[in-house]
A protein has these predicted regions:
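Bacterial N-terminal signal peptides
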Residues: 9-18
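Ankyrin repeat boundary/linker residues
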Residues: 55, 88, 121, 154-155, ...
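Ankyrin repeat domain, specifically the short helix-to-loop turn at the C-terminus of the second helix
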Residues: 45-50, 75-83, 108-116, 141-149, ...
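N-terminal segments that cap or nucleate solenoid repeat domains
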Residues: 24-64
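Conserved ankyrin/ankyrin-like repeat signature
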Residues: 40, 72-73, 105-106, 138-139, ...
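Ankyrin repeat A-helix N-terminal signature
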Residues: 31-35, 64-70, 97-103, 130-136, ...
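Leucine-rich solenoid repeat scaffolds
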Residues: 478-516
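Start-of-repeat signature of ankyrin repeats
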Residues: 58, 91, 124, 157-158, ...
């Protein structure tokens, strides 16, 4: 059976060759225009050359004239009977090319000559979508005048022209489409990922999709696009399949002016997404996320926020609306960069609060704002890690983001700890659970065997003597041992069970031993 396949293939190719030889006209005119030989092309047209003779891939002289952005050549071709309603084997048409290069003159010539006003490609992408993507409002207006379907949906991602305009920050096009009755609340296709597990196995976050035009505007930061959509009665709180609202989207993308506008227009600040992230949590998360850092397995990220509204303003605004200051995550939030951020910000898992999130980053400003609004100072995550334990350095791993922050990390930690202690944080609170089934589901590897440890273990792990001294001065006990029977000093001298924390430091050893003598 295998031996017959080459013979069959040869026969098919021979048949195609015979067919092609008889069907394809002389493409010399198309070749000349493609080569940019305008003078020769005009002479050929005047001499009666076949103006519809296509190249092997179906591209006609008219398509190449459009590509060359040549209105005069197009006019000559159309006058000789060139077909405007034609596509090549790639699904490209003269009209799609004219819209792509944003030449209104070419577009009008083609429409008047009978071009298909939709001219979709193989994925159903219409020329109105191209105009929306480019921000070509006059071309979009012309297409609509000739009957373009304002609500056409392409088949690849289920997106509309309105979504493209909002995503590319073209408010004038958004206004035009809304005025022409574009559906403002239709959502793009969503991926119902049955499993997000690799062969390792490990969960890997994959975006679900299902965004509306307002969500695209929120993601791109186009505040005027959002205003136009809201004026067209877009649902300000309509979430994605993951529960992410336009407000969450704006905050998550550092668009604080837009987020503020959404709240002023009635966006609900009491929503939460699949992971349990509320607008307050995301605002604190973005405030605590440094503008420049090394991403896990990724490049350095440099973010410049130009909005007049600061992230701290958004935290205060959301809190002023009366939201719960202590929402807790359902699970580890999706990672920036498309993965679960294994080994990065390990404590931001089930039960994490905005205060814990701020404490992980030693973000004293956010901590102070939250405490002023009665955030619970000792509310822990599922493992029992409190904000004070987190601020002291607990949850270390080789890829932890904290050593990548700029500036004096011990100074940041101390500023945060002072606020937490002043608010009544328990300096001897212990990690409660890293071994139960529930804890293991949420537990990162860096927290293995840390059950029973206190905040004092954190600076010992890092070698932060100033932080250790602060905790000792505020009542931290040296005689508490973890579930493996090791105290803070044991970690310095012997390391832990996994040998992660073996950091011999003479100054720290002396500090802990002296404190142990004093307390006994």
């Amino acid at each position: 059976m295998r031996a017959l396949k080459p013979l069959i293939a040869t026969a098919v190719l021979s048949a195609l060759t015979v067919f092609s030889t008889g069907a394809v006209a002389d493409p010399t005119l198309a070749d000349a225009i493609r080569a940019g030989d305008r003078a020769t092309a005009l002479k050929m047209i005047q001499g009666g050359a076949d103006v519809n003779a296509a190249q092997a891939d179906g591209t006609t002289p008219l398509q190449w004239a459009t590509y060359r952005n040549d209105p005069e050549l197009m006019k000559a071709l159309l006058a000789r009977g060139a077909k405007a309603k034609v596509t090549n084997s790639f699904g490209a048409s003269p009209l799609s090319e004219a819209v792509k290069i944003a030449n209104l003159d070419l577009v009008m010539q083609l429409l008047k000559a009978g071009a298909d006003v939709e001219s979709p490609n193989a994925d159903g992408q219409t020329v109105l979508m191209l105009a929306a993507h480019n921000g070509s409002v006059e071309i979009a207006r012309a297409l609509l005048k000739y009957g373009a379907n304002v609500n056409a949906v392409e088949t690849w991602r289920g997106q509309t022209a309105l979504m493209w305009a909002a995503a590319e920050k073209h408010p004038e096009v958004v206004e035009l489409l809304v005025a022409q009755h574009a559906k403002v609340d239709v959502a793009a296709s969503a991926n119902d990922w049955g499993e997000q597990i690799t062969s390792e196995p490990r969960a890997q976050y994959r975006p679900t999709g299902g965004l509306t035009a307002l969500m695209y505007a929120a993601r791109s930061g186009c505040i005027e696009c959002a205003r136009a959509l809201l004026k067209g009665h877009a649902d300000i709180n309509m979430p994605s399949p993951d529960g992410v609202t336009p407000l969450l989207t704006a905050l998550d993308n550092l668009h604080y002016d837009l987020a503020k506008m959404l709240i002023e227009q009635g966006a609900n600040p009491n929503t939460w997404d699949w992971w349990g992230r509320t607008p307050l949590y995301v605002a604190v998360d973005m405030h605590s996320y440094p503008s420049s850092r090394i991403a896990y397995n990724g490049p350095k990220v440099n973010v410049v926020v130009t909005d007049k509204t600061r992230c701290s303003d958004m935290i205060r605004l959301i809190l002023a609306s009366g939201v719960n200051p202590n929402p807790q995550l359902n699970m580890h939030r999706p990672g920036r960069g498309g993965n679960s951020q294994r080994f990065v910000e390990n404590l931001l898992t089930t039960g994490a609060t905005p205060l814990l999130r701020a404490a992980v980053a030693q973000d004293a400003e956010a901590v102070e704002i939250l405490l002023e609004r009665q955030a619970l100072v000792d509310l822990p995550n599922v493992m029992g890690v409190t904000p004070l334990i987190a601020a002291s350095g607990m949850g270390i791993s080789i890829n932890d983001p904290r050593p990548l922050f700029e500036g004096d990390m011990q100074g940041r930690a101390l500023a945060t700890l002072e606020l937490l202690v002043k608010a009544g944080a328990d300096v001897n609170a212990r990690v409660l659970d890293t071994t139960s089934h529930n804890a293991k589901i949420a537990r990162p590897s860096s927290m293995t065997d840390r059950q029973g440890q206190t905040a004092l273990y954190g600076p010992v792990i890092w070698g932060w003597t100033r932080v250790a001294r602060f905790l000792l001065d505020h009542g931290a006990r040296t005689d508490i041992v973890d579930a493996t029977g090791k105290g803070p000093l044991d970690l310095i001298l012997k390391g832990d069970v996994a040998n992660r924390d073996h950091k011999t430091d003479d100054e720290m050893v002396s500090l802990i031993r002296t404190a142990a003598v004093v307390t006994h």
